[in-house]
Amino acid sequence: MKIYGEIAKVRETVKAWKAQDLTVGFVPTMGYLHEGHKSLIDAARKENDRVVVSIFVNPMQFGPKEDLASYPRDLDKDAKLCEAAGVDVIFHPEPEEMYTPQFCSYVDMNGLTTELCGKTRPTHFRGVQTVVLKLFHIVTPDRAYFGQKDAQQLAVIKRMVTDLNVDVQIIGCPIIREEDGLAKSSRNTYLNAEERKAALVLSRSLKLGKELVAKGEKSAEAVKKVITEEIEKEPLAKIDYVEVVDFDTITPTETIGKSVLVAIAVYIGKTRLIDNFIVEA
């Protein structure tokens, strides 16, 4: 396994692979890798001849009061996980490699980025889309893998790839959870013992919503109500949003039907956590 910080090195390596007709799978990450990331790498390893993982804490997707400086980083640990999982190349650039002082081009999107996380993080998705498009141009993968935990991000990337004719297949992979149900996240490390216990309210409330849908409930308001009431029982929890939206367009819907995303964002203490489930039929 190689670790490169230079765009030119990655391009040179991928070009050599493609000259041999080898397929390339790509997993973009911000590092501090966990089992959720490993599941994406495993999927990429299974479906491609070569696998590239990027580790880049992208400053552009953090707001002015967000946790860029404190976002957890551990390249040695990440490299061990990647090597054990069969990754061929880690791309770990410095911000200066990705963004020159003259940088002024951005990917923006209407609609999909204004709801859910976009409401309280208005510049977040512009940063995500811009860096992901840059990474696609650098790595030129056949397939790229994203987790369903960041469901809005997955929808946004799919739309960007379609709208801008990017020649890459986007693969969404299931949420990976701890044994007690908490969705795996790098930000879980911010939680103290009491907050970690309180954070279970996210998966617990979504389970109630899912059970209601399974019984045939079609009212989005009814589903939101049962989820909200459960979260409000937890003193350490503060709701950012509880929403039911069309998964493809991220627009609010009043009726539970096919391809509907039930998504929540909740502050546990100072840590903002997200979770969701998708109604497939």
Language-model segments: residues:
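Short, Lys/Arg-enriched, disordered terminal segments
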Residues: M1-K2, A281
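Nucleotidyltransferase catalytic core that binds NTPs
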Residues: K2-L236, V245, T249
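Phosphate/ribose-recognition catalytic cores of enzymes acting on nucleotide-derived substrates
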Residues: V226-A281
